Every structure is written in C-alpha cells, then in structure tokens.
Amino acid sequence: MRLIIVSGRSGSGKSTALDVLEDNGYYCIDNLPAGLLPQLAENALINTELQQPKVAVSIDARNLPSHLTRFPELLEEARTRHIQCDVLYLDADEDTLLKRFSETRRRHPLTNANRSLAEAIRVESELLGPIADLADLKIDTTSLNLYQLRDSIKLRLLNQPEPGTAFLVESFGFKRGMPVDADLVFDVRCLPNPYWKPELREHSGLEQPVIDYLAAQPDVEEMFQDISTYLLKWLPRFAASNRAYVTIAIGCTGGHHRSVYITERLGQLLQQSLKNVQVRHRDL
C-alpha cells in the first residue's frame, strides 16, 4: 500500500494535488485529523471493504495543534505497519498567498476578528512546521499555474517507473527566484550568455543554434564536466541514504539558454547510471 500525505499552507494548491491523485486512482480523504493517521493505515490494510492500494490524505492547520506537534511520531507509527508513506508539502511565498486569497475572496481558516490574513498565514507556517520538516518532497507553487502544478505533481509523485530515489534535474532563472525545493543548486551565470547574441536571443537551450554556440565554449564544457563529476560521485550516496526525492537545480539569469543546455546534458548523462531521473525546465 502507498499512502501520500499532502500538506501545506492554505492557498498553496492542496486541493489541486488531491484532485490529481484522485484522477490517478488514489482514494482521497480531505482534512484528516492527524491523530487518526495510524488508525487509517491499519484499517486500510486489514479491512477488506476499505482496503486500497493507493490512499492520499490532506492534513492542514485546522487540526488540533497537539496533533500537529505529534505528527513525527504519528507518521512513524503509520510506517511501522510496512506502508510506503510519502509526505508532499506545498508552499508559496507570502505575497503570492495573499494575492490568491484576494483574487478568490475566500476566507483563510485561521483568520478571525483579531487576526489579519497575513498574521494567519504566519501562524499557519508555525503550526505546520513539524510536517514541513519531514516532507519527502516540497513543491514551491509560487510561479506555477494550475496546469503546471498538476504536471509537476504527476512528474514528481506519479511518474516513477522504478522504486528508489527520484532525481529531478531542473533549469531555472535567478530573476524569478531560486526553487525552494532544490537540494543542490549550481549557478552557471558566469558562462558566456547567448542572450547577447542577437541571432540567438529568441532561441532556447533546447534549440540547435544555442546548443552549437554553447558546445563550442571551453568554459561551458569545463563547468559541465565539474558538475558532472560531483553529481556522479555523490548522487548515489543520496540514494543510499534512503532519500525519496532529490532536486538538482541549474540556474542562469533568465532560465532560457545556459541553464537549459547544461540541464539537458546532465539529465542525459545521469539517466545512463541512475534510475528515475527526470528533467524539467521551470522558466521555458
């Protein structure tokens, strides 16, 4: 049995995540009291009417604070029943959450006459801290629209042909912020920039003119070799430590040229020696 626990601050995309999981065959429960987590795991295994191979639940700040504080031991108790438990934590920056509540005109569950929306969001962060700390996978939804979030969840949680650590090699542009879910970040902004070549500006690192230009630059090749050597040596150690997910982020200024080129090459290289290697270009 596989159990996916979805959590995160209000407005970060938990409902969308549950919808995706339900569409992919998961039995979903919204706003499960955290204290019932071990009981759910046991019932799903032994009760033939409830038995499901794939279950997903959301746990949010409407829980009793004491249950959220006890989340680490509740999760461990569920895992002792030999269930594969994955914790997905969704989040976005505070300005984005404020904007989403303003646009939808929904009420935050922790607001009241004495607590503003901004204060409620900060209180929610504290309450959900024990879950965030134990997340196997964190997804920053700040820059994702609905369809991108659905694709990201399917890519990271559901597209795993082999058991073991799932590796994501992701390009991004620093001007839109670093991915908060990145485990390793490599800055390639020091490399020659095709953006300053008028004939290359409108092309991406996936297109042959940019590929040919960057492949001819000695610094680019040296950077690629250095990053490759590091990853080939140390990523197997991450896998050996039972990490469920590892995100390697490659950043340039805009996320269109240098980081895309390096990311594509790294993905192709790592797929030759590691299982579950996926490639994503955040800002294309």
From Swiss-Prot:
GTP binds at D60, A61, R62, N63. Coiled coil: none annotated. SUPFAM superfamilies: P-loop containing nucleoside triphosphate hydrolases. It holds the Pfam family RapZ-like_N. Keywords: ATP-binding, GTP-binding, Nucleotide-binding. ATP binds at G8, R9, S10, G11, S12, G13, K14, S15. InterPro entries: P-loop_NTPase, RapZ-like, RapZ-like_N, RapZ_C. One of its GO terms (molecular function) is GTP binding. Displays ATPase and GTPase activities. Belongs to the RapZ-like family. NCBIfam families: PRK05416.1. This is Nucleotide-binding protein PSEEN1090. It comes from Pseudomonas entomophila (strain L48).
